[in-house]
């Protein structure tokens, strides 16, 4: 009986460890590892993310099993276990930002660049004969070497349907020193004729590509971006 109890506890701790890891992401892709395993379901008018539900259920029942054996005060009821499960997932995602930066610090090329997605956003203001790209890209060089590169921003789907251009290549060349955090402010105009008089995007979901003569690194957009891309 004790062997079964020990196995149950060990399995519960292993599940918690796996969820902790899978709630993270690589920064290059904003989707968590859990979301990449349990991919969102795309409907005509939206997306259903069920990976979060699976994560909560796994953490909840792991906590329940631990409480059944250990009688832990803070997880002895349905509500307390649910609250702890949600906090556990939030803390896992938060801690992942630090582990990702540590991992990137071992690179000596563009893979050492970390993007602060919460501080990065881009506007596309499209008039009949002109497209203005402006916004802020917040990055950190996690390595001990200087990194130099240019940036491409993937064209928003509705704009791409009219100009047939995959990326806007920004003219500014970026140089970022070791361990430096930089906010890059963008404001560039491109001459294009649009079928529609006005299109406006103000989002932080876009895909960005950092590139130089040696290599490139892609920071993928959110699932919402690719959902919209599939509509056009």
Predicted regions and their residues:
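Membrane-embedded alpha-helical segments of integral membrane proteins
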Residues: 14-66
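Terminal connector regions
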Residues: 190-232
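Short, solvent-exposed loop/turn segments enriched in Ser/Thr/Gly
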Residues: 129-136
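Short acidic, flexible loop segments centered on an aromatic residue
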Residues: 144-161
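Intrinsically disordered, low-complexity Pro/Gly/Ser/Thr-rich segments with frequent PxxP/GP/PP motifs
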Residues: 165-195
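Low-complexity, acidic Ser/Thr/Pro/Gly-rich terminal tails and inter-domain linkers that flank the onset
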Residues: 95-129, 158-160
């Amino acid at each position: 009986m004790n062997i079964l109890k020990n196995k149950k506890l060990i399995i519960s701790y292993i599940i918690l460890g796996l969820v902790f890891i899978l709630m993270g992401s690589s920064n290059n892709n904003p989707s968590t590892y859990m979301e990449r395993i349990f991919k969102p379901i795309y409907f005509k008018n939206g997306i259903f993310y069920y990976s979060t539900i699976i994560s909560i259920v796994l953490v909840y029942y792991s906590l329940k099993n631990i409480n059944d054996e250990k009688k832990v005060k803070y997880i002895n009821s349905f509500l307390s276990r649910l609250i702890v499960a949600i906090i556990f997932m939030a803390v896992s995602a938060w801690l992942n930002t630090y582990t990702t930066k540590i991992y990137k610090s071992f690179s000596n090329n563009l893979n050492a660049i970390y993007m602060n997605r919460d501080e990065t956003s881009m506007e596309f203001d499209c008039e009949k004969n002109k497209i203005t790209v402006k916004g802020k890209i917040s990055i950190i060089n996690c390595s001990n070497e200087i990194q130099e590169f240019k940036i491409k921003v993937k064209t928003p789907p509705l704009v791409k349907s009219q100009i047939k251009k995959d990326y806007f290549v920004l003219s500014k060349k970026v140089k970022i020193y070791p361990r430096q955090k930089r906010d890059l402010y963008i404001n560039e105009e491109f001459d294009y004729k649009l079928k529609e008089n006005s299109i406006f995007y103000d989002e932080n979901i876009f895909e960005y590509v950092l590139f130089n003569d040696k290599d490139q690194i892609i920071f993928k957009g959110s699932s919402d971006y690719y959902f919209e891309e599939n509509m056009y």
